[in-house]
Amino acid sequence: MVSLTIDGKDITVAKETTILDAAALLGITIPTLCWLKKVSPTGACRVCAVEIEGVDRPMTACNTPVKDGIKVTTQSEKLSRIRQKIMELMLVNHPLDCPVCDAGGECDLQNACYGLGAAKQEYGAVLERRKIRYDWPLIESDPNRCILCEKCVKVDHEIVGCNAIRVVNRGEATIIDTVDGNPLNCEFCGNCVAACPTGTLISKPFKFRGRPWAFTTTPSVCPFCATGCQIEYHSRNGRVERVTSDDSTYNSGNLCINGRFGYSYINSPDRLAEPMVKGQKADWNTAMGTAATALKQIVASHGADAVAGFGSPRVTNEDNYLFQKLMRSAIGTGNIDSEARLGFAATQKVLREMLGIAGASTTIDAIDRATAVLVVGCDLNAEATGMEYRVIKAATKNNAKLVLAAMRDIKLKKFANSHLKYRPGNETLLINALTKAVLEEGLENKEFCSANISNLSDLTAALAGVSIADAAAATGVTEADLRAAARLVGGKKGVAVIFGAELMRGGNTDAVKALINLALILGATAGDTGGLFPVYEKTNIRGLLDMGVAPDHFPGHQTDGTTFEKAWGKKLPAAAGKDLWQIIEGIEQGSVKALYLLGCDPVASFPEGERIRKALEKLELLIVQDPFPGEAAKMAHVVFPSSVAAEKNGTFTTIDGRVQPLAKAVAPSGDAREDWDILTELYNRLTGESRIHSPAAVLDEVAALVPAYASVGRTGGTITAQPRSGGLALAPVSARAVAGSPTTLLVGTILYHSGTTTTWSKNNLEIIPKGYIEIHPNDAAKLGIAEGGKVRLSAGSVKVEGTAKITPRVQPGLLFAPSHFRGMNVNALLSRDGGVVPVTVEKA
């Protein structure tokens, strides 16, 4: 610790502390321009100059560490003159085009000039106009306005890890530009725009939309991935025109392309604006009446079991709660499910059985403090970018060892100490081999295992027959790499284990169990550094299941419906309902006559899409409640146009149990209505009971019936349960090598889109407008396929065509295609068994 005096006030701080940070602890504000708390200091602007007794020149407070016994002065006439001159010199080369600059009203340079009293200009220069970069997608760069603070470069390199821009040239010719001088080719997260203190970097979609004070700012939650970033909608005249995030938020103001630019789906001209009945526009009374009458008739003729419904991770907790209440209480059916059946529901069941948790073992900020990170079967860049930022922070700021296990090269590889690029279908074998390597080398967390695990010997015995060398060869890695990976993650305190779609898709839980075994022997669930983190692409997947949108449990994962029967005053279905695939089979067999789709499009988004399409054609009643005219909506008998996240109040629950409120920024598009409002009216028409009048009232009902949500108020809260300790039972699983097929297709997410939602966003489509198929150069050469050429994939009777993208990111024999695009619809090639499928590939 170091003791010093600042402006006559004594303070003791850690020796690595800067003068700027020490002053802040005393409540003393030192002006800055180039300093940004979340990145390393640059010391470029020198506005933070301070005097230190005994030092013959002013020092920059942002990057000068404290020393014992020094006396610092932050405010004096001398410092005021210095700071004013610094500002005047900056303005010599600044165009002063404030009237037409998009940063006007929120420009740090303007504010600094005003705050420091820089009201005159004694200097002059002949300005050489520099070329404005209009050729970048989504972002415009005007180097004439740049003050060379380098905040954009620091954010790009240190937080995003993209390394797309840099400082180029020297002296008066210095500018910030792309690394190769070509148009910007990056992740288009816009974090550089947010960091820019002037109008050098601006959002092209927001350009000339208005001055910042003309917009209403509404704090909310990002509606895309399960990271749950906090955002602000900026709206005017009923339109959301911008999304930002403050650095004081849980996500430190960092967003991805979807969070910052994906908002344009809200304003899509393709939005459903009016109810429809049998393909014709109708008013709400007609649509509601048609749906209610048809549901009553089907229940009367065929029983309540003839009705089913799919909920959605895109809608709020309140919406999902009301949906399952409508199905169970008003209709009398337990046939309720969602896309969680495609993997996350089975994973959650294992987490609950083995650890007593419904999601992550702790909040995701614990990743920042991890000493080792293991990422398995997950492209964090695409599935949860906000979590990827935290892994990068752990690796670069905390020197955490990073091990990846993924079928493809992913962005995190540049930060990784080890990358186990395994063959498709061999996840469980790979994890078992890694676990055995940890145990063989004695790198398990012995203290945690001794205190908490009851059957470590069972796991050791189960792995006795596993040859690490044979497993390595079968999975496509080397024994040396496997053992090196074990040493990187083993023997550490504070291990974070993260896993995603490659492990969860299809609901085969062996790989998940194997990974939890590994996480436990590493002690990953102990303490507040590291943890166990399942990852899902869509924001409210955990809340969806917490609210009881599942055939086998009520809200709060309760299997006894007595509490809900008393609260709702209805006899509820005694047996578990049909799950997703049983519902589809029921439609095919004719026992399920009606299907209600809330915020989902199974034809475009689920595996076996063509089979599902044919099944939906057999229904007597298909109700679709959605903001967009997807494939299922085109087939619907009744369409209810609904709201998106920016048009409603409610809550989302993140994968790590943060229940966060979202606030209504604008009214629903056209004649669309909020989901909860639609559901409560239909409930009223079916039962005659009075309507619930607000999402807040729904949350109150949830809090009264679901113990985990009892402490969650209308402003949110955290429901993360601590994993069980003591008596934990490992779940040994066996695995054999999977030879695979000559060509395997992996279907997954990409950074630039989220589900099908962002395919309605013109901003996202500007970057990636259509689907494609990644193919290894060797495979492309064998088939005579050129970059950009047409490729045809076949699985059974289903055929899909797409554009070839030749890349060594995929291994030979493996193809990758993004799941988002309805026109290409590679999901139709998949079966219910997972996200990979053997395919035949040919030049189209």
Curated annotation (Swiss-Prot):
One of its GO terms (biological process) is ATP synthesis coupled electron transport. InterPro entries: 2Fe-2S_ferredoxin-like_sf (IPR036010), 2Fe-2S_ferredoxin-type (IPR001041), 4Fe4S_Fe-S-bd (IPR017896), 4Fe4S_Fe_S_CS (IPR017900), Asp_de-COase-like_dom_sf (IPR009010), MoPterin_dinucl-bd_dom (IPR006657), Mopterin_OxRdtase (IPR006656), Mopterin_OxRdtase_4Fe-4S_dom (IPR006963). It is an enzyme of class 1 (oxidoreductase). Its EC number is 1.-.-.-. Heterotetramer with 2 beta subunits. NADPH-dependent Fe(3+) reductase. Probably involved in acetate metabolism and not in the reduction of Fe(3+) chelates. Unable to utilize NADH or formate as electron donors. Unlike formate dehydrogenases, contains no W, Mo or Se. Substrates are Fe(3+)-nitrilotriacetate >> Fe(3+)-citrate or Fe(3+)-EDTA > Fe(3+)-oxyhydroxide. Also catalyzes the reduction of NADP(+) with reduced methyl viologen as electron donor. No activity with menadione as electron acceptor. This is NADPH-Fe(3+) oxidoreductase subunit alpha.
